């Protein structure tokens, strides 16, 4: 299986499908499943829980987290890659303990719903929002930023639900295993490196258009 084009991943996400995004070998060298938060389903959450096995998180813009009064988990981040975890949350209306796939999907969709208010969420909970760098992957080449950028490019709310992919033995899946996993489940694989190149191309194109205008 070959690495897919960024354009194909954008189209897949716009249709509500999941994709796998891989970062650089000299970074985490891991793959995350990404799906648009505004159309996430219980079935997609269950797939992440059963097959990917990582932590289900929601990559979000900082302004949305501020609007919901969801602060960073710690004031001083000492994690190696500075992943910006916030306080975990559960959506209260219409959910039970918050941990089921259905409850988690409700929480994710509520996080990106304009009608949600800070008091609608219990803290701590079972969904972990992540605060994305405001410059996206051009500011930080993480899965958090890739999820936000891809969903924005797909015309969705700029928030992606993400989950790391692990092997059956609990080790983290790398590119060879990720390609096998993707082929088995019919998912596209793209790289953050290609997403950075795609976005840099967009920036250059915008600059050229402004100069022509």
Curated annotation (Swiss-Prot):
Top-level taxon of the source organism: Bacteria
Record keywords, A-Z: Lyase, Magnesium, Manganese, Metal-binding, Riboflavin biosynthesis
Cofactor: Mg(2+); Mn(2+)
Annotated positions binding Mg(2+) 2: 28, 143
Residues that coordinate or bind Mg(2+) 1: 28
SUPFAM superfamilies registered for this protein in UniProt: YrdC/RibB (SSF55821)
GO cellular component, one term: cytosol
Any Pfam family hit: DHBP_synthase
Biological process, per Gene Ontology: riboflavin biosynthetic process
Amino acids binding D-ribulose 5-phosphate: 27-28, 32, 140-144, 164
A molecular function (GO) term: manganese ion binding
Enzyme class, spelled out: lyase
Reaction(s) the record says it catalyses: D-ribulose 5-phosphate = (2S)-2-hydroxy-3-oxobutyl phosphate + formate + H(+)
Pathway terms, separated by semicolons: Cofactor biosynthesis; riboflavin biosynthesis; 2-hydroxy-3-oxobutyl phosphate from D-ribulose 5-phosphate: step 1/1
Cofactor note: Binds 2 divalent metal cations per subunit. Magnesium or manganese.
Catalytic activity, EC: 4.1.99.12
Site positions (Essential for catalytic activity): 126, 164
Record text on subunit structure and interactions: Homodimer.
UniProt record similarity statement: Belongs to the DHBP synthase family.
Protein role: Catalyzes the conversion of D-ribulose 5-phosphate to formate and 3,4-dihydroxy-2-butanone 4-phosphate.
Entry protein name: 3,4-dihydroxy-2-butanone 4-phosphate synthase
């Amino acid at each position: 299986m070959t690495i897919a084009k960024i354009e194909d991943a954008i189209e897949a996400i716009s249709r509500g499908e999941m994709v796998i995004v891989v970062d650089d070998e000299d970074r985490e060298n891991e793959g995350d499943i990404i799906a648009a938060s505004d159309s996430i389903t219980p079935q997609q959450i269950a797939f992440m829980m059963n097959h990917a096995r990582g932590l289900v998180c929601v990559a979000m813009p900082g302004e949305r987290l501020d609007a919901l009064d969801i602060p960073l988990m710690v004031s001083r981040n000492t994690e190696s890659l500075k992943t910006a975890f916030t306080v975990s949350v559960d959506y209260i209306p219409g959910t039970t303990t918050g941990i089921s796939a259905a409850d988690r999907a409700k929480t994710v969709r509520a996080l990106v719903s304009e009608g949600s208010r800070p008091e609608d969420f219990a803290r701590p909970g079972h969904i972990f929002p992540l605060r994305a760098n405001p410059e996206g992957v051009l500011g930080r080449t993480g899965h958090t930023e890739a999820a936000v950028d891809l969903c924005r490019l797909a015309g969705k709310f700029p928030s992606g639900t993400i989950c790391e992919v692990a092997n059956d033995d609990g080790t983290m899946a790398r590119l060879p295993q990720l390609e096998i996993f993707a082929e088995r489940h019919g998912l596209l694989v793209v790289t953050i490196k290609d997403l950075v190149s795609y976005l840099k191309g967009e920036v250059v194109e915008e600059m050229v258009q402004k100069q022509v205008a």
